Amino acid sequence: MNKKLLSLVLVAALAMSLLAGCGSKEEPKTTTAAAADTTAAAADNETEAPADTTAAAGDETTAAAAGGNTTGETIRVGYAQVGHESDWRTANTKNYQDVFSADNGYELSFVDCDNDNAAQLEAVRGFIQQELDYIVIAPIETAGWDTVLQEAQDAGIPVIIADREIDAPDTLYDAWVGTNTKNEGITAANWLAEYLDGKEANILVIEGSVGASATLGRTEGFNEVAAEHSEWKILDSQSGDFTQAGGQEVMESFIKSYEGQFNVVVCQNDNEAYGAMDAMKAANITYGVDGDVIIISFDATHDGLQYTLDGAINCNVECNPIQAGVVEEVIQAMAAGSDYEKTTLVNDEAFVAPGITSEYATTMTEDILAGRAY
């Protein structure tokens, strides 16, 4: 495990950030600057991770400053971000830009890879050529990482995998920080079982991006519980690519094929849920607490939770995007030559519309929404 030996005292705190708007697709771009001056935006999350440590990524009501770099020298960090396809990714990008800012003692080289796996590999190789101090990767796909990770290791640059998981030996990277997306899928399905209480479910699933560990994890977890319910049937699943447009397009296709046959729609992020609701509204299909179709979503962004509070989304399972402060803790420990956890899970939870269930989720309230920073 690569560690840089510098003299410092480890300071750890966590950062929250206000949600920025989604950007449109564009060519991958690199930004090196104080994070607050960078406006690249970015989308979603991963498969089950071994749970060595669970870290609270931050209280939503607090916009606390990050711990900051105490080495006395600027630390150069490269972040290869998935893209900017969802509100979740936008919040995650803003969080990294805030934590790894010039004011906090960092120089952040940020690349929005626009969901292009080849561009992401190129970005990481660019970080290696720049001889940055640390590389952080939110991987677009799970496979194909061995070679470039070996190149980083040969160059003596520590690598932290963030948000999503990869299919590579853990000896090729130094740490992983993220959420347990398989558990998110299990949580969603357990909530549905409580809500239906033995009633039949005819389910349509709008999955995330093909090959993303968030897609794989949420699908695996949900299907694992669904297999225990003979009264449930998954009619179809298609990728909405974690976007609102994708969610709407898939839902329109589902309506043509299954109108009148389904009563549950599972969307693997909030943006897909917005698109699905638009499609159902156009087809005069009612949804939510007072409708004919149950909607389950993931991410629990501010807008997603507003829909949950209003009863349009029945259940929304959080995937916490505020992870940069935890990554900073790891980097500061590495820089100090201190011990650190190989794997850190970021806390998240589930929220439900008021007055429908209690056991598996937190009932949504105005106070929760008011304190939401993303």
Residue map of PLM features:
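Bacterial lipoprotein signal-peptidase II cleavage site
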Residues: 18-33
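Short, solvent-exposed amphipathic alpha-helices that sit
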Residues: 88-102, 106, 184-191, 213-232, ...
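Hydrophobic alpha-helical segments within soluble ligand-binding/sensing domains
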Residues: 70-73, 77, 120, 176-202, ...
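Hydrophobic alpha-helical
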Residues: 128-129, 133, 137-154, 222, ...
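Short beta-strand elements at the ligand-binding edges of bilobed clamshell
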Residues: 110-112, 168-191, 205-206, 237, ...
